[in-house]
Amino acid sequence: MLNVVILAAGLGKRMQSDLPKVLHTLAGRPMLDHVIGSARQLQPARIIVVVGHGADRVKAAFEGLPGLQFALQQPQHGTGHAVQQAVPQLLEGDGEDDVTLVLYGDVPLVQPATLQNLLQARGRGVAVLTEVLADSTGYGRIVRDAQGQVCRIVEHKDASEAERAIKEVNTGILAAPTARLKDWLGRITNDNAQGEYYLTDVIGLAVGDGVPVGAAQPGASWETLGVNSRVQQAQLERAWQSELARRQLEAGVTLADPARFDVRGTLSCGRDVFIDVGCVFEGTVTLGDGVRVGPHCVLRDVAVQAGARIEAYSHLQQAKVGQEAVVGPYARLRPGADLGERSHVGNFVEIKNSVLQADSKANHLAYIGDADIGARVNVGAGTITCNYDGVNKHRTVIEDDAFIGSDTQLVAPVRVGKGATLGAGTTLTKDAPAGQLTISRARQSTIEGWKRPVKKS
């Protein structure tokens, strides 16, 4: 039976923020959410988050998730003291297979595969996740015996000069038999330079009890990087985005510049996708085969089908784009926009909660809201569907092959029949019959002999 304890009680003073440190984001998600996500992939019996500073805000952000519980550390007296607060909630089954994995809410990118390796390295004993660093300043050192076995971990402030020369460091992440961990946590002391209860002291206790201590290393160095400042947060953000870019490149996506590419959710791409510079992908985004995304676009929870083009500076949110459709430049698709195949939505066109069927076009300067637009419809520049009466929204229906002249207002609820034409400048307040020209502008007249006024002296 696997328990996961995530330490998330820290103040995060160096972040210079009122927001609890573990709620600061990485790739659009709270750091703690990344850790919980990795832990869930191990299918633990229980996840216990130890909270302290900003406990109510942290709990509010995650409360209600199945299998997730909270323990309060108040005040904070070190990592060992933090895990002690979770002890009453640890589950135990048949004994030997009961294990507790300790993770950190501010070390957000440790991957499930690395954690699986750590659990395997444990055998029937304890395992720690270690890293070899060129500069190990500030880290706890891994001390090994003459046989190369881990015998203890010494914190930097308590280390001798010889120990400080060690390059293998403790990441803080460990796995231990649950029953023994409970015993060791009851035996650790705060007799150290910091006056705190160190979780790392359980390693020395394990060795003293004859329990083997194994070690595993992460698949990549960025997996064990922690965040204690805005600088470190920014550095880790770039490291993670670089990794996400690498994965897309290896999957066959062309990125104009991998250093100017941001994913803040999940991005799934087909074959031969091209993504230009400065694009941001949020939520769940799917790009079909041959899709091209121009520079500086933002796509949030969007599905784009094969062969479509999203031109520069377009913003799409909760929208669908059909095959070979063209969006932009400078277009905005709001929630509920659904574009059919080969449809065109051009510059400064906004579409919300509307369907635009195959081969229809709104190429310039239009607002289409709460509308059902058929196939092969042309929407002229300056067209507005007037969908809101101040209280309720109303729908506009434009049937197949209709032609909407420029500078037209359609006051919903209203219907334009199949093949109908609306003359430029029309304000439509009643249904327009199929196949007919409907026009409502005033008749043009010329006033002969009219003179412009002149400025009085």
UniProtKB/Swiss-Prot annotation:
One of its GO terms (molecular function) is glucosamine-1-phosphate N-acetyltransferase activity. GO terms for cellular component: cytoplasm; membrane. Binds 1 Mg(2+) ion per subunit. Mg(2+) binds at D106, N228. Keywords: Acyltransferase, Cell shape, Cell wall biogenesis/degradation, Cytoplasm, Magnesium, Metal-binding, Multifunctional enzyme, Nucleotidyltransferase, Peptidoglycan synthesis, Repeat, Transferase. Homotrimer. This is Bifunctional protein GlmU. It comes from Bordetella parapertussis (strain 12822 / ATCC BAA-587 / NCTC 13253).
